[in-house]
């Protein structure tokens, strides 16, 4: 129906749409070639369960979580936090204090 309406208004548009539909129908109705049935042989399939259970703490994926590094003194970090708590040194911000 749309094709007939376009054909009445624009003869060239109707013809080109008709050719487009004809080519599209031919491409869709043509039989597709069958793919060869290539499947993985049974001896290559992976086992569903692990043969040996993992020892220790594991997550859902069977991975052990990383443990944090052993706590020790961190002098540079502790100094930075101490300075941060003390507040800024205003002498660093004003150049004319010593003048």
UniProtKB/Swiss-Prot annotation:
One of its GO terms (biological process) is protein N-linked glycosylation. Keywords: Endoplasmic reticulum, Membrane, Transmembrane, Transmembrane helix. GO terms for cellular component: endoplasmic reticulum membrane; membrane. Disruption phenotype: Mutant males are normozoospermic infertile. Mutant males neither have significant differences in testis/body weight ratios nor testicular morphology. They do not show any alteration in basic sperm motility. Sperm from mutant males passes through the zona pellucida, but fails to bind to the oocyte membrane and accumulates in the perivitelline space. FREY1 and SPPL2C double knockout mice are normozoospermic infertile. The chain crosses the membrane at residues 10-29. Key regulator for male fertility expressed transiently in round spermatids where it recruits IZUMO1 at the endoplasmic reticulum (ER) membrane and coordinates the oolemmal binding multimeric complex (IZUMO1 complex) assembly. Upon complete assembly of the IZUMO1 complex, its ER retention is released, facilitating IZUMO1 complex export to the acrosome. Through the interaction with SPPL2C, inhibits its intramembrane protease activity directly accessing the catalytic center of an I-CLiP. Interacts with SPPL2C (via active sites); the interaction stabilizes FREY1 protein and inhibits SPPL2C proteolytic activity. Interacts with IZUMO1; the interaction retains IZUMO1 at the endoplasmic reticulum membrane and coordinates IZUMO1 complex assembly. PANTHER family: PROTEIN FREY 1, SIMILAR TO RIKEN CDNA 1700029I15. This is Protein Frey.
């Amino acid at each position: 129906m749309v094709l007939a309406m376009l054909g009445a208004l624009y003869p060239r548009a109707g013809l080109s749409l008709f050719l487009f539909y004809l080519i599209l129908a031919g491409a869709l109705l043509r039989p597709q070639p069958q793919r060869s049935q290539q499947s993985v042989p049974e001896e290559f399939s992976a086992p569903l369960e692990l043969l040996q259970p993992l020892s220790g703490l594991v997550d859902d994926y069977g991975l052990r979580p990383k443990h944090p590094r052993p706590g020790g003194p961190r002098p540079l970090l502790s100094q930075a936090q101490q300075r941060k708590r003390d507040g800024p040194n205003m002498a660093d911000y004003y150049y004319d204090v010593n003048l």
